[in-house]
């Protein structure tokens, strides 16, 4: 009897291992049905809970894992769903929906090749399955978008890469790799808010994602927030020490910051030659950093203006606004250089651009000044006519008049052609006009200030150049021209 009891005990211990408990099976089915009901109501969290209870009761039922995988997919938890789908086909390799869900999870996560294998297996089991056929096409399309994007990235056609990634993400919405590539290209295109949004979204789900940290840093770096950018690059390298892009970006950011600061220091100390060299070196570090390079060009333009290399300064400022057409400081610097080189039309154009952007009193006055100088430049330039500087003294103006008046006097050219005589007479008259204005302090002041423009000129209607000439040289008999052969004259003054 003792032996029989011992045997019963042994039988009681092994029965649960050999026979499935019918009650457990029924309870598991009940949980599954409740899960189905919640799934139908789109209450996926409750559906997940009941499918989990069913699995706990019967862990070897493939359909339970398949159902829970479907629920996790609806919740966007594709990696967990993939695990359940894979378990379902391990338990039952003929489970077509299990293979479909496995493929769908692979595709959603961006593994198109693995997805193709799953869909192929589903088609082997059911070659007419329309869903498997369509999903197989989708997976192949994603692989094609990946290939195109890879080639276009090397070509630096970032707009095309963004397009390809958008198409791929329609089938692979949970693929961080595609999102990161898109975000990086958005950053390269200067679309920083969009790039930051994508990277931040990934970091909310995975704060240790080195690629997302790199892209966040890249956006800050290209927005000229270099110190903050370095912090993100360092964090990315902490998560992935071999992250090559983060390493290069971090090195460039530090070098750019150092060179720019050294250039600023040299400029403040008045060492313009050194500042020029440092800004030039900084410009060679990273041609992709548009905002920082725009500032560097403007800074170098300022240095060139200090060195009175005004055309070089204009070129630097032009490069700055090409990189950043909203850069007010560069427009102002270039406009001043245009004023200094008497390119008034260009100066007016730049000041108009500035005033349209920032309607301040200061900018309005700068525009008015440039417009006045432009008007003044279109009238006769009496200083040029006499060949004197704007700061010329009274004696210098008189000497210049004496020289030019004698040079262009009609009597000197009496033997020339009618055309030459006419031109010299015109110049003689202009010389007289110039002397009349510049030798009179009041008229000169009005001319210099542009008041004559508002007064519709200097009213030279009664002007006679010969009278000015006679008065200057002492009246009739005070001078004479004597010809000595063609083109030769002697001037004799009383």
From Swiss-Prot:
Domain (J): residue spans on this chain: 381-451
GO cellular component: cytoskeleton; cytosol; nucleoplasm
PROSITE patterns, A to Z: DNAJ_2, TPR, TPR_REGION
Cellular compartment(s): Cytoplasm; Nucleus; Cytoplasm, Cytoskeleton
Residue positions where Phosphoserine is found in the record: 393
Matches recorded under Pfam families: DnaJ, TPR_11, TPR_8
Modification sites for N-acetylalanine: 2
Entry comment describing in which tissues the protein is expressed: Widely expressed with high levels in liver, skeletal muscle, kidney and testis.
Cystines in this chain: none
Keywords from the named record: Acetylation, Chaperone, Cytoplasm, Cytoskeleton, Nucleus, Phosphoprotein, Repeat, TPR repeat
Coiled-coil regions, chain positions: none
InterPro entries reported in the protein's UniProt record: DnaJ_domain, J_dom_sf, TPR-like_helical_dom_sf, TPR_rpt
GO annotation (BP), single: chaperone cofactor-dependent protein refolding
GO MF annotation terms: heat shock protein binding
Stated name of the protein: DnaJ homolog subfamily C member 7
Species for this entry: Mus musculus (Mouse)
Protein encoded by which gene: Dnajc7
């Amino acid at each position: 009897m003792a032996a029989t009891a011992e045997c019963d005990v042994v039988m009681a211990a092994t029965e649960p291992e050999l026979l499935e408990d019918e009650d457990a099976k029924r309870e598991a089915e009940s949980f599954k049905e409740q899960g189905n009901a919640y799934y139908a109501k789109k209450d996926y969290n409750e559906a997940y809970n009941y499918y989990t209870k069913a699995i706990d009761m019967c862990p070897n039922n493939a359909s339970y894992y398949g159902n829970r995988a479907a629920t996790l997919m609806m919740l966007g938890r594709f990696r967990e769903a993939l695990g359940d789908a894979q378990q379902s086909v391990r338990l039952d390799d003929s489970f077509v929906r299990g293979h479909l869900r496995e493929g769908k999870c692979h595709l959603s996560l961006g593994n198109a090749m693995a997805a193709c294998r799953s869909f192929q297996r589903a088609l082997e089991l059911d070659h007419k399955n329309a869903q498997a056929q369509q999903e197989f096409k989708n997976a192949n399309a994603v692989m094609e978008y990946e290939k195109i994007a890879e080639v276009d990235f090397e070509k630096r056609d970032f707009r095309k890469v963004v397009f390809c990634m958008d198409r791929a993400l329609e089938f692979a919405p949970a693929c961080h790799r595609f999102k990161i590539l898109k975000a990086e290209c958005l950053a390269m295109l200067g679309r920083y808010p969009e790039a930051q949004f994508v990277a931040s979204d990934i970091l909310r789900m995975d704060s240790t994602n080195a690629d997302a940290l790199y892209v966040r840093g890249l956006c800050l770096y290209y927005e000229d927030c270099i110190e903050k950018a370095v912090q993100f690059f360092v964090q990315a390298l902490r998560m992935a020490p071999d992250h090559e892009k983060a390493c290069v970006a971090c090195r460039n950011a530090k070098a750019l910051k150092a060179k720019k600061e050294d250039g600023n220091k040299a400029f403040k100390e008045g060492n313009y030659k050194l500042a020029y060299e440092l800004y030039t070196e900084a410009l060679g570090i990273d041609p992709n950093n548009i905002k920082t390079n725009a500032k560097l060009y403007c800074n170098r333009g300022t240095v060139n203006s200090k060195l009175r290399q005004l055309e070089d300064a204009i070129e630097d400022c032009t490069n700055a606004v090409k990189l950043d057409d909203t850069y007010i400081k560069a427009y102002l610097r270039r406009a001043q250089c245009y004023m200094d080189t008497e390119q008034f039309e260009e100066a007016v154009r730049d000041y108009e651009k500035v005033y349209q952007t920032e309607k301040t009193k200061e900018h309005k006055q700068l525009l008015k000044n440039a417009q006045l100088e432009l008007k003044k430049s279109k009238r006769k330039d009496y200083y040029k006519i006499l060949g004197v500087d704007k700061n010329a003294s009274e004696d210098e103006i008189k000497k210049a008049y004496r020289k030019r008046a004698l040079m262009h006097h009609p009597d000197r050219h009496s033997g020339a052609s009618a055309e030459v005589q006419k031109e010299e007479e015109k110049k003689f008259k202009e010389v007289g006009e110039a002397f009349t204005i510049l030798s009179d302090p009041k008229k000169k002041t009005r001319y210099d200030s542009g008041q004559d423009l508002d007064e519709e000129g200097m009213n030279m209607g009664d002007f006679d150049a010969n009278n000015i000439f006679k008065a200057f040289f002492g009246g009739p008999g005070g001078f004479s021209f004597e010809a000595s052969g063609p083109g030769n004259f002697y001037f004799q003054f009383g």
